[in-house]
């Protein structure tokens, strides 16, 4: 079980790490996507950003969190915390990006499929929250 769990723990965050790298390589495009879907940013937060556009700052923050939390899970260092952050990130992605309930036709099918895929990823992340880093990790703790 320990090797299987370690392999699973390593496989789950690959999608987040790859996605984060792609976002960082095209931060302007990711910021435009966030602007287009109007992810809410409180004015109190925007006031601290100085001259940086708020959606560019949000793009860097989200891509950075996705990358760091994904790597935390891969190496098994505070994997529970990394998985918790990615659970919130994934749920927000379904709510703000894959709003299939507001769509029709091919868009409905495509975004519903993405939302269901993300639900499966949420399940895997919940298992990591339940078990933790496990063996074969930097924390080297056996599952509870």
Enumerate the predicted regions with their spans.
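Extended, low-polarity transmembrane helix blocks
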Residues: 1-36, 44-68, 74-144
């Amino acid at each position: 079980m320990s090797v299987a769990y370690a392999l699973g723990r390593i496989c789950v965050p690959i999608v987040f790490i790859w996605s984060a790298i792609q976002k960082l390589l095209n931060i302007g495009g990711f910021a435009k996507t966030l602007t287009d879907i109007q992810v809410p940013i409180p004015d109190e937060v925007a006031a601290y950003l100085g001259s940086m556009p708020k959606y560019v700052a949000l793009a860097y923050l989200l891509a950075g969190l996705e990358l760091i939390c994904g790597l935390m899970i891969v190496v098994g260092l505070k994997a529970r915390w990394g998985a918790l952050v990615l659970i919130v990130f994934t749920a927000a992605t379904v709510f703000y990006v894959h709003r299939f309930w507001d769509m029709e036709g091919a868009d409905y099918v495509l975004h519903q499929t993405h939302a269901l895929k993300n639900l499966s990823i949420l399940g895997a992340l919940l298992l990591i929250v339940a078990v933790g880093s496990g063996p074969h990790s930097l924390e080297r703790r056996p599952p509870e």
